[in-house]
Amino acid sequence: LTHSEVDELADTIVSLREKFKLTILLVEHHMSMVMKISDQVVAMEFGRKIAEGTPSQIQSDENVVRAYLGGDI
């Protein structure tokens, strides 16, 4: 997806969630979108859960930083 398509998808997901009071399970690799629209995030590495929490908790989790960026905070 292009950047504008990712933004449009995020807006659509948020709109549907709010309009119909839905819980949405999103499996996605566009992390900026995930962090922008999610209340809770589960981070996985090789099929194993390595962290769960709010977007801000996930962004500062040492296991997530190591797995996704290859370094320490």
Place the predicted regions along the sequence by residue.
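Glycine-rich phosphate-binding loops of nucleotide-dependent enzymes
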Residues: 1-73
